């Protein structure tokens, strides 16, 4: 069975504008920016795109964990990374698509284009971050006045919100590459295969992909030490993840204020509905919903479920979480304690 890290987070921000959508078309003012929001039913919810969350994550890995990020190549109207998951950990964990063709000369001396596209499905998958409760978005009108003459007005959206998100990491996919002629699975070309083997990668049979004769295709797996380091850094980065628009005047802490982590023998994401809106239209974490998920997936959860909460956020949950943690399958502590204890368990689960 496929083992995946499964994570659920709540972040809590005040007077923020974490991900903007460009010019505000609801006003005639030229210098006005709108935040990203989406309509659900007849209510508006502020959100951060999954791409933006990934950008924060990747940038944190570069700055806090010294990841050497894959250089970006720009050609005409396209841009892509080096598509080298052996050398660059972000190409491995975040995936890539490098669509390209090169000119070759065939056996008859004729020149033709050959497809050399490389793609990789990201082992790290994540949702958008979206406010749990409907969001009242305020327009803040400001002006630049530190000059002679008329002031220059500008506007921006701001909001307060508790936002939820979920993510997963495929433990067996991280650091493991295929060369199957299929979109998302053509991870390596011959040069990269050789590079992987030069780095002591293991060549192994693909349990799912076969050639026309029924023979298994090959996978190339990096050493366990390398794979473990990349996965561990990715999870641990949540302790210090930072980012978001308008940070100069609207600084916000985007680290989790509540987190749930476990390893699941499935690629399913079971934690999507752990947060809900209460009668006062405020965000609320549902312990009964968590208990139901843990019970329903008890045959697929490997090891314990780790819960972390930052003191000062949803303090009303403290007693219930402590009581729940008397269950041997549940760990409860601070955010960083939960992340670090989960990593200890995960290290034993990586193939």
Positions of PLM-derived features:
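RNA-binding basic/glycine-rich loop and surface signature characteristic of RAMP-family CRISPR effectors
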Residues: 1-351
């Amino acid at each position: 069975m496929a083992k995946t890290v499964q994570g659920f987070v709540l972040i809590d921000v005040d007077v923020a504008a974490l991900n903007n959508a460009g010019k505000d078309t609801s006003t005639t003012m030229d210098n006005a920016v709108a935040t990203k929001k989406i309509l659900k039913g007849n209510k508006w919810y502020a959100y951060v795109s999954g791409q933006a969350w990934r950008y924060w994550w990747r940038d944190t890995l570069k700055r806090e964990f010294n990841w050497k990020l894959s250089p970006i190549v720009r050609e005409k109207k396209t841009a892509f990374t080096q598509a080298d998951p052996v050398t660059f950990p972000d190409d491995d964990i975040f995936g890539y698509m490098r669509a390209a063709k090169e000119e070759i000369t065939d056996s008859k001396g004729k020149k033709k284009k050959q497809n050399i596209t490389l793609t990789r499905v990201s082992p790290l998958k994540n949702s958008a971050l979206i406010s749990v409760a409907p969001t009242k978005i305020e327009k803040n009108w400001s002006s630049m006045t530190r000059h002679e003459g008329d002031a220059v007005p500008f506007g921006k959206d701001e909001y307060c919100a508790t936002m939820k998100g979920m993510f997963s990491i495929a433990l067996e996919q991280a650091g493991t590459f295929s060369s199957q002629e299929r979109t998302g699975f053509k991870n390596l070309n011959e040069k990269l295969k050789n590079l992987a083997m030069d780095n002591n990668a293991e060549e192994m049979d693909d349990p799912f992909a076969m050639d026309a004769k029924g023979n298994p295709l090959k996978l190339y797996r990096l050493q366990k030490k390398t794979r473990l380091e990349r996965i561990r850094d990715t999870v641990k980065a949540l302790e210090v993840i930072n980012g978001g628009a308008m940070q100069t005047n609207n600084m916000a802490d985007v680290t989790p204020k509540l987190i749930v982590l476990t390893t699941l023998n499935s690629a399913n994401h079971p934690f999507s509905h752990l947060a809900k809106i209460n009668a006062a239209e405020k965000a609320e974490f549902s312990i009964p919903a968590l208990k139901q998920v843990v019970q329903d997936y008890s045959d697929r959860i490997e090891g314990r479920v780790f819960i972390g909460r930052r003191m000062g956020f949803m303090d009303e949950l403290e007693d219930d979480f402590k009581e729940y943690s008397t269950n041997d399958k549940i760990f409860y502590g601070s955010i960083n304690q939960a992340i670090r204890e989960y990593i200890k368990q995960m290290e034993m689960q990586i193939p």
